[in-house]
Amino acid sequence: MGVYLNPGNDKFYKAINSEIYVDKTELIQYTNRVFNTMQQNVCVSRPRRFGKSVTANMLAAYYSRGCQSEKLFDGLKIKEDSSFSKYLNKYNVFFINMQEFLSRSKTVEKMVLRLNRILMRDLKQEYPDVDYFDEEDLAESMQDVYQQTGCPFVIIIDEWDCIFREYKSDKEAQEQYLDFLRDFLKDKSYIHLAYMTGILPVKKYGTHSALNMFDEFSMIYAGPLAKFVGFTETEVRELCEKYHMDMREIREWYDGYRFENCEPVYNPRSVVNGMLFGSIRNYWNMTESFEVLQTYIDMNFEGLKDDILCMLAGEHIPVNTGNFTNDMTTFRDENDVLTLLIHLGYLTYDSTEHCVYIPNNEIRNEYANAVSVSDWGEVSKALKNSADVLNAIWNQNEQMVAQGMQRAHFETSHLQYNDENALSYTISLALYAARNYYSVYRELPTGKGFADMVFIPRKKFPDKPALVVELKWDKSAKGAISQIKQKQYCKSLEQYAGNILLAGINYSKKDKEHQCIIEKIVK
């Protein structure tokens, strides 16, 4: 057993020995199906903390000759598959975490040299009796091992794209790295499976097509591997039952990723943390700074800022993902920025409607954090002041609520959407902080000149009143209250039994002044 050649199954053992392990071993059914075929080169891209390394460790434990893993798979789904024994622990596996090598090298050139030397060392230690033609040529030496032993190789590369993320503008270094991977992987009879993971898909790095033999499965198209991207809704529901967590709140905070022919997919790390810690909160920011998001949404592309505002309010935005070049520096318009945000996990993609939206509350908080410290004028101010507006509603401070709505409305009034949507954006922006305490529902009666938003307290905040906020134009705040009462508090409140605050807000199109009336109802 070497360090990189046939590394064993210790890491997979740690995963299945954890308090929460969700069985994703059926992925091996797919890799066995494409083993030593024209589809044997597989690249899976997902955001950070979506289980890429756990999957790679599982494949190493399954295929590697350096360990005996049959008992580790006892009780797991793949054990029942007819192909399980055929491929178990029978291959030479090179497991490479590319980030590890890059971190220890000052340049990509030195990284490639180091990688060659270390893999060659492991190969010679494992096979000291092989007659190597050129001990400095890794690919040729692997061919020598295969010819003289008959044992094929499986190559597993984790963080394959780290060069493109850390050397974003160094095209020469990127092409040098791709040339290495091509020489290492392409058209090699002794490699029967190559499995790479990263955040970015492989293709379209300029005109360089060194790795065009890979089938790619990404956050835009995951194909038959969709259910392995994260936790499915069925898996999350089982965890909620075991840990006595509220499924509705878990869905609002960590759900939202959609793929063809697959049930909803949840952020796995956040679900695990929520279960283990018994707390539904933002775990995304424990692994990724909002400054990463801020870099991209601050780009000066026409329409990008408006798109972000609309998505913060819950809208779906059309997007063209076809022109994205799969790097982190080449952006021609807002479509390329939005496509990158899909791959980073900050947006989810609806392949049927060809549109994007913010997947859940956890990610929506990241946008709010990024916008609040950006130079977005009144938008940033409105987000920062949203907690004050929320407190003003709780305290029935009508003047302060009117002022907060007026600030937010100033920024959203230019959006070229129908009036009801523009009004809902205003409420969403002015009361953004309410999402920490409430589940939020929108009711937009088309053509009626007003928008309702209903805020129902989360289970952990039973002392908070429900809120119904209605914004109208050129009517009266009192009329807005009457409108709410006539609607019997909206459908969203039919099952709610606590206190309710009704906030009716009206504004004049002529002078832009806002008035507010708040009434308390004991239901």
Question: What are the residue ranges of the model-derived segments?
Answer:
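Domain-level recognition of nuclease-like catalytic cores that cleave nucleotide substrates
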Residues: 492, 498-523
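Active-site metal-binding core of divalent-cation-utilizing nuclease and nuclease-like domains
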Residues: 144-149, 435-462
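Conserved catalytic cores of phosphodiester-cleaving nucleases, focusing on short active-site segments
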Residues: 427, 451-455, 464-473, 487
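Short secondary-structure junctions
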Residues: 431-439, 495-497
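Phosphate-binding site recognition
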Residues: 1-419, 434-437
